[in-house]
Amino acid sequence: MEEAIRARGVTRTYRSKGRETVALAGIDLTVPAGATYGLIGRNGAGKTTFIRIASTQLLPTSGSVAVLGHDAVADPRSVRNRIAVIPQESRPLYFLNVYELVYLYLKLRGMPGTEARRRTEAVLVELSLDSRRKTLVSHLSGGMRRRAMVAMVLASDAEVLFLDEPTTGLDPVARREVWSAIERAIRDRRTVLLTTHYLDEAEALSSRLALIEGGRVLLEGTPAEIRSRIPRPFRVSVQGRVTREELLPYGEVAEVRGGHLVFAREEEARELTRLALAKGFPVSMAPASLEDVFLQLVGRPIGEDDPEEEGTA
Ligand SMILES: Nc1ncnc2c1ncn2[C@@H]1O[C@H](COP(=O)(O)OP(=O)(O)OP(=O)(O)O)[C@@H](O)[C@H]1O
Ligand SMILES: [Mg+2]
């Protein structure tokens, strides 16, 4: 396996106004080349800090990171030539229009004019920005501005792309256009390190994922591996006149609008589903989603904040 990013024992402590924050407490990660790797975790977990270190914008307090075999601390120049970054907070150059933003970015990276023009045209169509090509970046809506940043980076020929929440604030259609663009980048044998709070997105795009919590890697693996690593990997949604007490023997129960949600092991999940069907209650059984896993591992107990669970039976 070719490695795009190899991090060992990476720590980072921020010091400001006499206060110390340990943002990374020892991160080991191996990101294979030619695939999308997802970093997920709660706000403040350390994802952006890791991306800034691996993309040579921030020095680690200790540990090492190599990108495509080049040391990010000792040899940042070699790394910078081969990567492109969408930072979490980005302010594109406001006096340019959308076309210029993308085209000049590619030129600045050393791409010949003809190639830069061809790629700019293609990415503007791909991300539905073509009709806005002459619009000043400062006149774009927030989501369109974000798309323009995504366009710049995806049109580049960088081998490793660091995308820190590229789809935050995008409408559902635009989000899927970005997914397609990321998938195309992977077909071109590039590597994407992605952070996102949309766990359906993390699951749809990533070959592997790391769940970061408190500056450490809590879990790492393929989405399926991660989903199977919780004690109760199935979710059963039951509607109808069933009490919490009746459901408790089957697993972990949460009351949701119109019914109950039970997280259970496979056997119990099947049994409960059969029983509910026999009684004529609407029921559905499915593997736990990545979001379920996330909530079970790093969230509050299920049910405390589960507003989306309605009408899924
Ligand atoms: N410049 C800074 N100075 C001091 N503390 C910082 C700085 N940047 C980040 N931190 C702290 O480091 C920790 C990790 O932050 P980081 O931005 O890496 O988290 P994140 O996982 O990207 O979160 P989010 O999902 O909200 O983007 C947090 O506790 C944050 O407050
Ligand atoms: Mg962040």
Can you describe what each PLM-predicted range is?
Residues 1-7, 13-26, 76:
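A short, flexible loop at the N-terminus of ABC-type nucleotide-binding domains that lies
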Residues 103, 107, 114-132:
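Conserved ABC ATPase "signature" region
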Residues 155-159:
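A short, proline-enriched helix->beta-strand linker immediately N-terminal to the Walker B motif
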Residues 161-165:
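Catalytic Walker B motif of ABC-type/P-loop ATPase nucleotide-binding domains
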Residues 220-221:
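ABC ATPase "signature
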Residues 232-304:
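Short, charged/small-residue-rich alpha-helical element at the C-terminal edge
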